[in-house]
C-alpha cells in the first residue's frame, strides 16, 4: 500500500523533464523567445550560428530547449538535434509574408523525418505585435497544418518581446507531451 502511494505521489509531484527542439527560419525570434522564457527579459541577440540550449522551468516541468540557428546554410544541421525530441517548436515570423512558403517547406521536410515521428508540434506565430502580421488562422493555412493528419499540433499567437502567448504554448506542450508518456 505504501509503495503504491509513493509511486503515485512521485508521479504527481516529481519534476518531469522534456526535450524540446526550437527551429524556424532566421530572424523568426527563436533566441528572443528562449531568453524571454529563461530570464523573463528581452536580450539583444545576434544571428545564431550553431545553437543555444537552456533549461526552462515551468510548473513541475524542466524543459531543455535547444534553439538552433535558422539561416539557410545551417538548416541541414537541424537533423542532428532530432533524436529524443519530444516536442518541436516551430517559430514563424508572422510579418514575413515573403518567406512563409519557405517556412512551410522547411517544416514539412522536417516532419517527414523518422526521428521526429512521435514529437508533438507547437507553432509559435510570432511577432503578433506588428501591424501587418498574419493571424494564427492565416499562418495555419499557409503552413498547411491541416494536412498533418498523423501529427498532434497546435498553433499559438505570440509576441516574444512582451512574452504574450509563450507560457500558453508551454502549457499546451506540457499537457500534450505528458499525455503521450
From Swiss-Prot:
Major place of residence: Golgi
SUPFAM superfamilies (alphabetical): P-loop containing nucleoside triphosphate hydrolases
Endpoints of the signal sequence: none
GO biological process terms, semicolon-separated: protein transport; vesicle-mediated transport
GO molecular-function terms, A-Z: GTP binding; GTPase activity
Binding site for GTP: 24-31, 67-71, 126-129
Keyword GTP-binding: yes
Localisation per UniProt entry: Golgi apparatus
Cellular compartments per GO CC: Golgi apparatus
UniProt superkingdom: Eukaryota
CDD domains: Arf1_5_like
InterPro entries (alphabetical): Arf1-5-like (IPR045872), P-loop_NTPase (IPR027417), Small_GTP-bd (IPR005225), Small_GTPase_ARF (IPR024156), Small_GTPase_ARF/SAR (IPR006689)
Lipidation (N-myristoyl glycine): 2
Keyword set, alphabetical order: ER-Golgi transport, Golgi apparatus, GTP-binding, Lipoprotein, Myristate, Nucleotide-binding, Protein transport, Transport
Similarity section: Belongs to the small GTPase superfamily. Arf family.
UniProt-listed NCBIfam families: small_GTP
Alphabetized PANTHER family for the sequence: ADP RIBOSYLATION FACTOR-RELATED
Described purpose of this protein according to its UniProt entry: GTP-binding protein involved in protein trafficking; may modulate vesicle budding and uncoating within the Golgi apparatus.
Protein name as catalogued: ADP-ribosylation factor
Upper taxonomic lineage: Eukaryota, Viridiplantae, Streptophyta, Embryophyta, Tracheophyta
Amino acid at each position: 500500500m505504501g509503495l503504491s502511494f509513493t509511486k503515485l505521489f512521485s508521479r504527481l509531484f516529481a519534476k518531469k523533464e522534456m526535450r524540446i527542439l526550437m527551429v524556424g527560419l532566421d530572424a523568426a525570434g527563436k533566441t528572443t523567445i528562449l531568453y524571454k522564457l529563461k530570464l523573463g527579459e528581452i536580450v539583444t541577440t545576434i544571428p545564431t550560428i550553431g545553437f543555444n540550449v537552456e533549461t526552462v522551468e515551468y510548473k513541475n516541468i524542466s524543459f531543455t530547449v535547444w534553439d538552433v540557428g535558422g539561416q539557410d546554410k545551417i538548416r541541414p544541421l537541424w537533423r542532428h538535434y532530432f533524436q529524443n525530441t519530444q516536442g518541436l517548436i516551430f517559430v514563424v515570423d508572422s510579418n514575413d509574408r515573403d518567406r512563409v512558403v519557405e517556412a512551410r517547406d522547411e517544416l514539412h521536410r522536417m516532419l517527414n523525418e523518422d526521428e521526429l515521428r512521435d514529437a508533438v508540434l507547437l507553432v509559435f506565430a510570432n511577432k503578433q505585435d506588428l501591424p501587418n502580421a498574419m493571424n494564427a488562422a492565416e499562418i495555419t493555412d499557409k503552413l498547411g497544418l491541416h494536412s498533418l493528419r498523423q501529427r498532434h499540433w497546435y498553433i499559438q499567437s505570440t509576441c516574444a518581446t512582451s512574452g504574450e502567448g509563450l507560457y500558453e504554448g508551454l502549457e499546451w506542450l506540457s499537457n500534450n507531451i505528458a499525455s503521450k508518456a
